[in-house]
Amino acid sequence: YGTWTQFSNLRRIIMTTETKKPGRIADYNKTLPILELYTCIQSEGSRQGRPTVAVRTTGCTHRCWFGEGGWCDSWYTSIHPGKGTYTFNDIVKIYDENPTITEMMLTGGSPTMQPDLCNELTHFANQRGIFITIETEGSHFIETDYPFGLISLSPKFSNSVPKIDVTTPMGKLVDQKMIDKHNSLRLNHQAIEQTLAYHSDYHYKPVYDGTEETMNEIEEFRVRHNIPKNKTWLMPAGDNREELIKQYPISLEKAFEMGYNWTGRDHIVAWDTKRAV
């Protein structure tokens, strides 16, 4: 019964919106919009603690600022996006050099802005027996040829909207244009419905800043999309060790109160603002 219901819901959702199938990457030596490529331990969410290869794309639809929690911890892919430096062959090579790793964390930025890369990675993962987790805010639905193993969904609530005249990490002042860009696809509910229905599994990983306003938005979103509490992982805001640790007890208590799971951000606790860890 559950399988048939899932199929019916998927068919209904996909039929309501035309979706363009992503392409493939023919040239494995071409430089792609990948800013970082490294081995690490997954430090957030339901697959925490597993050795993985992180593939970080550059470019993002959002400009997240969490007040005292700081800017997005990967601001160098979004607010001030760097240029990609890696090829698909570099991904092949890192798995060849680390044959015991069978996980991939596709992150950003916003990796769903790169549909052909996402699709090619699902082919590679299917051939190699690799489990892909894609971290996404849900702005774009991609009907990849093979579903992702896990959608790690972190939608952007009102606590992520930057404020006028706040200074970005590289000294730019926030203006209305930046705010409008951030809000344009901040909660694309239709794309989120399609994504959760199509791909293999998901967890919901909202960023919590300690306010009741944010918690209300987190819970409203969970109810709207029929997300079970056991698939919800509350994560504290913070782009550095000091701010993050301040939020740990607040978010732990709230997760317990709400009946959610809780996740830390171990890479920030261990290495603070160091990149590629």
Residues of each region from the PLM?
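Short, Lys/Arg-enriched N-terminal segments with co-localized hydrophobic residues
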Residues: 1-14
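Conserved Radical SAM active-site core
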Residues: 16-42, 51-52, 58, 62, ...
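A short catalytic or substrate-binding loop motif that flags glycine-/basic-rich loops and adjacent residues
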Residues: 46-48
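Conserved AdoMet/S-adenosylmethionine-binding subsite of the radical SAM
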Residues: 92, 96, 101-103, 112-277
